[in-house]
Amino acid sequence: KELDRTIQVICRMEKNNPLHVGDPGVGKTALIYGLANLINKGQVPDRLKGATIYGMDMGQLLAGAQFRGDFEKRLKLILDGASKEKSILYLDEIHNIIGAGRGSDGGPDASNILKPYLESGAICFVGATTHEEYNRKMLKDGAVTRRFQTIDIKEPSVEEAIKIVTGLQPSLQKYHKVSYRKEALEYAVTASAKHISGRCLPDKAIDLLDEAGAYLEVHPVENRRRSWVTK
């Protein structure tokens, strides 16, 4: 339902920038992978068909920006390029844009640079942050926050988490060059829910599957044309 809500927000005329707010590990990034998968399959409204999702790394933009205006030029170059096509910019840990790039000379930070693009609607932005950082940082800049539509992301149930990791199955298989059986996906979710405390689904289940794939890369199964991850 969070993915459906995200798509619905993007289709709005105003405040069409979804902001995913939830505890670490509840699947905020997985939602973006799910959205990309639906766009790739064409299973989205016409407004989103053919759209390209880009992830924007604020740390890389800041790296090496030593002189006044360097960061602003870099960011505007990306935003101007993205506005020329049907783009969705994903900002993980979006709270970092507050104050990012602002030097002692009083130049504009990332949030101020983004405001005109948020207003114009030429680019759709999808942000993600935790409740703590949303309250601590995002709410301090009301001009940015009110241009986003907040979507509360809760920890999924076991059944929902199984669907999420199933959606990520192709990318995990492609990366590790292994195949994950359906039973392995289900076991990763149920076992992590039962035995791993202090963390949320689906993140802890994805970690188990990723670790299993890495193990088979280091310890390949001999005399098999393809390795299978089972429980």
Regions found by a protein language model. Name each.
Residues 1-231:
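AAA+ P-loop NTPase nucleotide-binding core of proteostasis motors
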